[in-house]
């Protein structure tokens, strides 16, 4: 099984952070802020963040039998998106926690279409609003002073509220993603601040091939030229607990 290069690098970084993080900060003991906050059975908070939505398109070389046109598509750019949500964590043990994170993702993707026969170009901007409910397992290293690194892994089911408004190419509303990442609990005097970076990889084909909504048959060529589409995300999140 071939491992995605981004996943490989993130796994190595997570392992290094989890195993070596405390040693980097082990010069001296300091007074601990919020020393008993991790003893609570349930933890709650909120978060804001930024993300980068990636759309991978797989062209199939389809040629229109009527015109001889052959189109290829590429997601050439994606704007920086915004994320906001709430955090609920159930403490399973001293090092394990189960997290549920109802989230709203707002983002934009841009697709360029190119006709290989005529060199004609076309484009589509896809604005998306996702309601997601990630469920993650959190594995934390022992706390040292006011620093505690951790890694997470889980799944993220989501629904795109705006998929019905997409024109040339449309994606399915439901998507399921695998996510993994790393972060660090930083214990402040009155709250816990948690920066986290994670990578999300789509597990299914989100290309909608059933375009009964199209009234112009010539617009179907963009969908016919693609076999499948998958989505990925890099998410930088700041939690406040």
Segments predicted by a language model, with ranges:
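Cleavable N-terminal export/targeting peptides
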Residues: 1-38, 239-241
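Predominantly the C-terminal beta-signal and adjacent terminal strand-loop region
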Residues: 31, 173, 186-241
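Outer-membrane beta-barrel channels and translocator barrels
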Residues: 39, 93, 142-146, 187-191, ...
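Residues that define the transmembrane beta-barrel architecture of outer-membrane proteins
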Residues: 40-42, 78-82, 127-133, 147, ...
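Flexible, solvent-exposed loop segments that connect beta-strands
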Residues: 58-75, 108-129, 161-171, 207-226
């Amino acid at each position: 099984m071939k491992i995605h290069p981004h996943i490989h690098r993130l796994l190595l970084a997570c392992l290094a952070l989890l195993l070596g993080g405390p040693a980097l900060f082990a010069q001296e003991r300091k007074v601990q802020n919020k020393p008993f906050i991790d003893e609570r059975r349930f933890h709650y908070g909120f978060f804001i963040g930024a993300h980068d939505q990636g759309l991978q398109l797989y062209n199939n070389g389809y040629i229109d039998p009527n015109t001889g046109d052959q189109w290829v598509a590429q997601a050439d750019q994606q704007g920086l998106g915004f994320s906001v949500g709430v955090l609920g964590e159930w403490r399973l043990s001293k090092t394990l926690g189960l997290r549920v994170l109802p989230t709203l993702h707002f983002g934009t993707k841009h697709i360029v279409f190119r006709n290989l026969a005529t060199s004609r170009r076309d484009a589509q901007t896809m604005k998306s609003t996702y309601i997601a409910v990630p469920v993650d397992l959190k594995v934390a290293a022992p706390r040292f002073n006011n620093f505690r690194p951790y890694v997470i892994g889980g799944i993220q089911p989501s629904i795109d509220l705006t998929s019905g408004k997409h024109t040339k190419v449309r994606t399915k509303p439901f998507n399921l993603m695998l996510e993994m990442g790393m972060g660090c609990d930083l214990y402040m005097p009155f709250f816990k601040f948690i920066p986290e970076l994670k990578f999300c990889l789509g597990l299914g084909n989100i290309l909608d091939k059933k375009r009964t909504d199209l009234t112009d048959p010539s617009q179907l060529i963009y969908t016919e030229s693609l076999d499948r589409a998958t989505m990925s995300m890099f998410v930088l999140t700041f939690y406040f607990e």
